[in-house]
Amino acid sequence: MDHHQRALRLGAAVLIFAISLRLLTGGIFQPLTAFLSRPDILSFLLYLQTGRVVSPQVSAPTTAPPVTTAPTEMTAPTAPMEPDTAVVFSAQDLELVEVNYTVDYRPDLETLLTSPLEWSLRQEKPTILIVHTHTTESYAGAPEEVYSENGAYRSLDPRYNMIAVGEEIARVLEAGGIRVIHDKTIHDYPSYNDSYGNTRRTIQKHLEAHPEICMVLDVHRDASDGVGGQLTTSGQVDGQSAAQLMLVAGTDTAGNFFPGWQQNLALALKLTALLEQEDPGLTRPVTLREHRFNMDLTPGSLIVEVGAAGDRLEEALLAAHAFARAVLALAEGANTE
């Protein structure tokens, strides 16, 4: 970030704080609160703090744009591949899965992929929690968003950010008989740097209230292509253009206590294999990271990267639909051959 721009933002933030303090001492608390709660002011304050441009549109217009609607041909979830039975994985399924290592660990992938998964996700109480650490992440073409090659799409509007993607996953899972809690808390606003800490508290709250939860999905989208531009992914679901999916598993490499990280990796391998069986090329390599990203809270935790900033929302929704179908296929667990 350019130091001159950072200094200008800091100066503006100090000026706004001084004016706000002066107004507060003048006894106009309610008008000031209303002013600071305006979407355009919230967006500006986020820019001052992080340098990120966020769409100020937070209230739904009278008529929602067509892009917010899931593709009509995908409105009914496809039946899971093995309904009401455990899936069986073999060593040959490992050929469908790639792993991108950012750590020195080299676990036995065949053993993890073919290991039993003993659970039943179809219960009377919720068994899956969906959260969004970077809730304001959005996609190309969202209304009123400002885009630059070195920037990132962000939106406070739940019809365009990660909440919309989480809603599609939850909708398909619920239709398949799985009870879901979709927490729509915005964890990356106003403080982006506190995002994972905010999400951790949210997850802990739900696990305490619903100890039967055995899968926590932190749904994101990817951003950079590694050379300064916005990444665009390319996959297909039932012959239709879709965003690609990437599952991220954490480890204890960064020094945090996380003894069960291989269980989460095993789940990522299983889901990726199922996705590739149904729609070859839909997934990117499973990524093994050094940080735990709150995955230590339950063995069924994953980060799900649905497409990237350069993809369209409707492509992300189609990929989310396919991901939910793969979860449905694992609803009754997995057995060894």
Please name every model-derived segment:
Residues 148-152, 224-260:
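A short, glycine/acidic-enriched catalytic loop
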Residues 260-287:
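Active-site-adjacent substrate-binding region
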Residues 135-138, 186-190, 221-226, 252-255, ...:
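Solvent-exposed loop/turn segments at secondary-structure junctions
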Residues 129-131, 180-182, 215-218, 246-249, ...:
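Structural recognition of the beta-strand scaffold that forms the well-ordered cores
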Residues 1-5:
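N-terminal Lys/Arg-rich, disordered targeting/topogenic segments
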Residues 281-337:
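Active-site-adjacent mobile loop/cap segments within catalytic or ligand-binding domains
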Residues 166-170, 200-204, 265-272, 301, ...:
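Extracytoplasmic/secreted envelope proteins and their assembly/folding machinery
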Residues 10-214, 223-229, 321, 334:
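N-terminal catalytic or cofactor-binding beta/alpha core of small enzyme domains
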